[in-house]
Amino acid sequence: MRSDAIKKGHLKAPNRSLLRACGLNDDDFNKPFIGVANSYIDIIPGHFFLNEYAKIIKDEIRKNGCIPFEFNTIGVDDGIAMGHDGMLYSLPSREIIANSIETVMNAHQLDALICIPNCDKITPGMLMGALRVNVPTIFVSGGPMRAGVNKHGEKISLSSVFEAVGAYEAKKINEDDLKDIECKACPSGGSCSGMFTANSMNTLCEAMGIALEGNGTILALSKEREELLRKAARRICEIALDERFKIRNIITKKSINNALVVDMAMGGSSNTILHMLAIAYEAGVNLDIKELNHISANVAHIAKIAPSLNTVYMEDIHKAGGVSAVIAEIAKKPGHILELDTLDISGKTLKERIENASIKDENIIRKINNAYSNIGGLAILFGNLAEQGCVIKTAGIMGERKFKGKAVCFNSQEEAIKGIIKGKVKEGDVCVIRYEGPKGGPGMQEMLSPTSLLTGMGLGAKVALITDGRFSGATRGLSIGHISPEAAEGGLIALLEDGDEIEIDVDNYSINANLAQDEIAKRKANFKMPNKQINSRWLKMYQKLVSNASKGGVLDLE
């Protein structure tokens, strides 16, 4: 056992003495030691109950002959951190989470790991840390929140609240309407109810085979979710000493491909691209951002979920057959690109896992011959504005897929929010928000407030928004993020001026500023990088080490 390094032989008497102080006895030193990486925190709706979930898991681990050791990571709620300086810390928190998993697991030489994530950067951060440790690992998340219901009986979610703020600013709704939506959008614990980043990543854990069936869709705080916790705890005890189930044997090039296929089929958050690039990096898998368009071109988009379709939520996907039903339907397409021989932590191949899966409601998960689109719900665009690529959630486009408009430039999200409220962005414009990339922010803020304001003001289908920052999974519209190289690296987005013509063609994967080469050269020669004051030592360190979005925003130590 890996844990013998802290519990076997006379030299380890001091180590055992400390372990005895934690309640262990002689028999316990012959059992596998299992790390239980929790992310309990009171301020996140998807996490405030995870302390109780950890108790269920630890109890089941003890019943099955192993010793659990719980520890915690930090967590940031992107929705609460939204629209102020707190969002600068969201993406950097992914690195702290990864580092904490690596630190605790390796410092104590634990044999296996069960992770309890749920929201935002916590799932990818835990995946990255677990890949560094490389022991048998299972992910079991807290589960999605059920959808809210407004006074008109319509299903709503957190994105409805952000958009309601825009509608209120545009005087389309009154204060009572706004309060009703605010109070009813998030009715219970869980990760926000649509196909936002949290649910996207928890779904992809299932697709990669690192989580049991139902992980992405079984509701939080349900009896079914509690049974999934017990099942995961029993399974980690069964595989704790089995090298076949080391996480790097599960998360491979093939399983990452499967995750991206599911991502495209379900129109996941654009943040998944950033995180999957980082996960591939930690797994030692070469994943080029250019590969993603090939995957998208070969995958039908068969499930639309809020915010792309505001009548469908994760609870509906679960009732309609869940992630397995989506995979099973995609596998029916001749020449599909799923890798069905991949092994998952249940001990089954993907082919075996989906054998009995089927769609139970074709209005929620469509058949391939009735797909929303014959291509996936995410795309990578290239051009002089994004030589290294940028990301768009095509599943969320509300208007035209070709767009030509004049740039309205802002040098921060805060500046953009003020400008949008004052009416500076009008129909036909391209709203440009720059210096918000991993280096420029630093921290790559999410642009949910600007996009939601535009949508709520009735401009969602009438303008485009481009940024070197990123978007919440709750964003919809012609919203293009992760522009690389970013403004802080001197990318062309930094040289744009108000009135420049920008052309976007989603179907041809292109994004360009219609500027002559001599004009670009002239602007480069006169360009001065804005001096952005950063007071945080952590953010300064992050800014010096982080790569741009085309590489996943990982810390580049080479």
From Swiss-Prot:
Pathway: Amino-acid biosynthesis; L-isoleucine biosynthesis; L-isoleucine from 2-oxobutanoate: step 3/4; Amino-acid biosynthesis; L-valine biosynthesis; L-valine from pyruvate: step 3/4. Homodimer. Belongs to the IlvD/Edd family. [2Fe-2S] cluster binds at residues 119, 192. It comes from Campylobacter lari (strain RM2100 / D67 / ATCC BAA-1060). It is an enzyme of class 4 (lyase). This is Dihydroxy-acid dehydratase. Pfam families: ILV_EDD_C (PF24877), ILVD_EDD_N (PF00920).
